[in-house]
Each structure stands twice: as C-alpha cells, then as structure tokens.
Regions:
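A conserved structural/catalytic subdomain of Rossmann-like adenosyl-cofactor enzymes
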Residues: 1-172
Length: 172
C-alpha cells in the first residue's frame, strides 16, 4: 500500500512472460521492500528494483546475473567507502574542536582508527578483483564473494558500534 500516489488501496503488479519455459508461477512479496518518503508515500530505489528483478533471474536459473549484480554492488560500495573516508578527517577535526570531554574525544579517535583499517579492505578487494574478475564458475565466484563480505563484516560492525558510542557520548 502507499506505493502509487493516486491509489490508496494496495496494488499488485502482474508481469506476463510470453517466453516462459515452465509451468511455475513466481510471486514476489515486496510489501516490505521500499523507502519511506513520508507518512503516506513509499518509493522503490534503484537497488530495490534491481534486487526484485534479480529474483526473477534466479528463478529462471540465471545465477550468473546474480553474481554480476553482487560485483556491481561491491564496486559501488568500495567507491562510497573511499569517498566517505576522505570526509572523515575534516569532520573528526571539527568534532574534536567542539567536544570538550575525554570520552567524546576518545570515541572520535576510535572511529578514525577504524576508518584507517579500510586500507586492508581495499587491498583485499583488489585481490578479489584480480583473482576472480574473469571467473566463469558461478559457484566459485559466489563463494569468493561471500568470503569477501565476511572480511568486511568486522569493519562495519566496529564502525556501527563506534558511531553508536559517539552518538551516546554527544547526547549526554
């Protein structure tokens, strides 16, 4: 519901595939896949649409499309991480000037240290690209993607914890 601006009732979209090769019907429940714009409106992002579309590809057995999508997500994610890392130093300097307690300064320092570990992840990503760029075996490449994601998990968990800690210190 609230997906279409002129319709107040829930809606269902049906897509018919004339080149369908089997008798199976794919139904995707996308009720919880959206970005809330305001109280009354929801919107699909480009990533939401890609994720829903890839489900159809997986249903048809085209796993290589899924692996390619994950590669694009990794590339875009690394690009955003590098962009954000460049912004960390100026913002942390401003925070250190404003914060007058030791706890806040320590929290900022821990976040800066966490961002410094991004260099190892960039190296790991470059190794992944070099080793698996031309990989044709879908299972092997997908396994490598899972391992790469696992390498990033501690970075994001620590970053999340650090931001929560900084937020808590600033609010006190």
């Amino acid at each position: 519901s609230n997906m279409f601006y002129t319709v107040t009732l829930p809606a269902t979209l049906w897509f018919f595939d004339k080149a369908k090769t089997d008798d199976k019907i794919l139904f995707i429940d996308a009720r919880n896949i959206f970005t809330q714009i305001d109280r009354a409106h929801r919107e699909f992002s480009e990533e939401h649409i890609q994720n829903i579309a890839i489900i159809s590809q997986l249903h048809k057995g085209r796993r290589e499309k899924f692996v390619q999508l994950i590669d694009r997500y990794f590339a875009a994610g690394m690009e955003r991480l590098v962009e954000n890392k460049a912004r960390v130093e100026p913002v942390s300097s401003q925070l250190l000037e404003v914060l007058d307690d030791a706890g806040g300064k320590q929290a900022v320092g821990e976040l800066v240290q966490q961002w410094a570990t991004l260099a190892k992840l960039k190296t790991r990503y470059a190794q992944y690209q070099g080793k698996h760029a031309d990989e044709t075996a879908v299972d092997k490449k997908n396994k490598a993607q899972q391992q790469l994601r696992e390498a990033f998990d501690p970075f994001f968990a620590a970053l999340h914890d650090g931001l929560k800690h900084l937020d808590k210190v600033v609010r006190q």
